[in-house]
Amino acid sequence: LYPGVPRITLEEIVPGSPFIIGNPEGNKVEVTPLRVMHGKLPILGYRIGKMAWITDMLTMPGAEYDLLQGLDVLVMNALRPQPHNTHQNLKEALDNAQRIGAGETYFIHMSHHMGLHADAERLLPPHVHFAYDGMRISL
């Protein structure tokens, strides 16, 4: 091989089966893929340590909720107030956030139908927020 060419090892990702990612300095974190549904299409969300990233979700099988217990941070989609056939609306996202019970929840993947950020944010519980471009979250 040529110097500097990265070596890649492909690993199969299996929903519900954790794997470890890390860097050369030895920092490692466990990642657990989660089954979620984008309408009728199965996709994956991820629990990454004490944080989870779930986007493009409409529904999630009941067993996956068990894998999300004890989260500090949940990042999840909330498209708009009205129902949609492939994404959670605001009520569905709020219901799922309450069921999961993370310390803080951040909604992403919102459309302009959600309204102005400051106005819409006032409708959320204190531990739930609309994320924004450039936002930083401490883990």
Where are these regions (language model features)?
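A general structural motif
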Residues: 34-38, 55-62, 85-88
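Binuclear metal-dependent hydrolase catalytic cores
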Residues: 1-54, 119-139
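Binuclear metal-ion centers of metallo-dependent hydrolases, dominated by the metallo-beta-lactamase
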Residues: 16, 61-139
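Short, hydrophobic beta-strand segments that form beta-sheet elements in well-ordered domains
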Residues: 52-56, 106-107
